[in-house]
Structures are given as C-alpha cells and as structure tokens.
Amino acid sequence: MSKKLTFQEIILTLQQFWNEQGCLLMQAYDTEKGAGTMSPYTFLRAIGPEPWNAAYVEPSRRPADGRYGENPNRLYQHHQFQVVMKPSPSNIQELYLESLERLGINPLEHDIRFVEDNWENPSTGSAGLGWEVWLDGMEITQFTYFQQVGGLATGPVTAEVTYGLERLASYIQEVDSVYDIEWADGVKYGEIFIQPEYEHSKYSFEVSDQDMLLENFTKFEKEAERALEEGLVHPAFDYVLKCSHTFNLLDARGAVSVTERAGYIARIRNLARVVAKTFVAERKKLGFPLLDEATRAELLKEDAE
C-alpha cells in the first residue's frame, strides 16, 4: 500500500480518475435521499436514449441505520462516490480496477471478488444486474447494469459504480471505526460527524412528530402530482425524494405497519414512474439534445413513422 490517503484525498483521486474517463464532475444533489442512485443525475439520466457520463459524491441518509454514533460501521448518513456511464463502456470493470490502483490498492496483491448481487429498488421501480465488489473480505462497491429505471426499460444500458467511501477509507487507513478515519490531515471523521449522527439518530427514533410526517407525506405526494400535471419533471422529482425520506423517517420511528409499508412504497413508485415517463417525453420534445446529430435524426425519424 502507498501513503494512506485521507478521506478527502480519496474523493479527489476518484474525481480526477473519472474526469479522465470523460465523466462530468457533478455536485451532490441538495435534497435528502437514501442512495446516490436516487439523484436525478442517475435516476433521470439513466432513462432515454441520450448518453450520460457523470461522477459525484452523494451523502446518503438512512434513518433506520442510525446508531447514535456508537456503532463503528453503521451510520444515519454515509457518503457514496457515484459513477454512471451510459452507454456502458465495454471495459468498465477494468476501469474500476484501475481506479483502485490509483488509490494504492494493487489488484494483484489483494483478493478482489465480484459477488453476484442483483439490485432492486422497489420504491422507484428500478432494477438491474449487479455485483458486490469485495476487497479482502469487505464489501466496498456495488456494481450495477440498469435494466429498468422508473418502470422503463433502459437503452442504452447504464453502468453504475457506487463506492462506499467510509468502508474504502477504513480499509485504506487500516482503522476499525469510521470515526477514526482521517478526513484531512489532523481532522478525524468523528470530529465532524459524531454529533450529527447522535442527534439525527435521537430525532429519527425518539423525537420526530409522526402525525406531522404522515401529513407531510400526503402533501408532498399531492404537490408532486400537481407539478407533473404542469410537465415540471424536476420539481416533481424533488417531491418524490421528499416522500421517500419522509417514509424512511416514519419507518425508523416504527410508525408504519407491514401492510402500510407496502402501500407507501407503491405510492412512491407510482410517482417515480410518472416522473420517468414525463422526463423522456420532455427530452423528446427538446429533440434529445445530448445525442449526436445523426443518431438524433434517425431516432426522431423512427418515432415519426
């Protein structure tokens, strides 16, 4: 192993590597979400015919995983480094292994395994062929080829690579607790995040107002529907994300029964599907601007026929 990179050096290294592969370096999307996949930079851009290559860090909130800052590996909020490439390069796995080498991890010196783990997100109507990537026995990455997003079949296929930054940093820095990770020289992860972890856990499990959350879910759902009636995809999707996070808070609080849980997930999924269809329709009206001229002309001609 080379010099132990800090957390922010890991991010900078990955950004530089994927920038070299032609990815847009996006910024984290400013609405709560449970995974980088739910960012519009992945969810929306994975559907339709236009090419899209992007990489970004996404803070991901999972209220039920909060442990008051007492568990060394389970967190209310963790960070993912998300890469999406569409169409998927034929050498995407080789590129991924090369990215690990940039981080000082030589694939020839470590046990790196791709373990089949097909992916599904019921609340957004999304699924794909997938693998977990295990490094010396620890999962550090999820690899997915999207087959369906928002209930729509994908084409061309999008490849998604999701690095778990805390796990990766724990491995590189050889620490047992995420709170001991060096975020930057002289500053530990715990000095930044242990207090928010405690407070968000306490809020999620003990303090949140269930009646308010239930009311908000319905309001967010109706507002998403209103936005969709006006063809406003991005505001509508923001409210879908708010529905999802509100549901996760309700779930963490134990305010949703098993039967109700399925109903809430179905309501979010129905909205996500309409968002996906509307997004593709709106991009088509614009003439799919990210396509090259020849492909665009051919595609629009086929649709006209």
UniProtKB/Swiss-Prot annotation:
Keywords: Aminoacyl-tRNA synthetase, ATP-binding, Cytoplasm, Ligase, Nucleotide-binding, Protein biosynthesis. InterPro entries: aa-tRNA-synth_II/BPL/LPL (IPR045864), Gly-tRNA-synth_heterodimer (IPR006194), Gly-tRNA_ligase_asu (IPR002310). Its main location: cytoplasm. It is an enzyme of class 6 (ligase). CDD domains: GlyRS_alpha_core (cd00733). It is found in: Cytoplasm. GO terms for molecular function: ATP binding; catalytic activity, acting on a protein; glycine-tRNA ligase activity; transferase activity. Its EC number is 6.1.1.14. Coiled coil: none annotated. One of its GO terms (cellular component) is cytosol. It catalyses: tRNA(Gly) + glycine + ATP = glycyl-tRNA(Gly) + AMP + diphosphate. It holds the Pfam family tRNA-synt_2e. SUPFAM superfamilies: Class II aaRS and biotin synthetases (SSF55681). Tetramer of two alpha and two beta subunits. Belongs to the class-II aminoacyl-tRNA synthetase family. This is Glycine--tRNA ligase alpha subunit. The lineage of its organism: Bacteria, Bacillati, Bacillota, Bacilli, Lactobacillales.
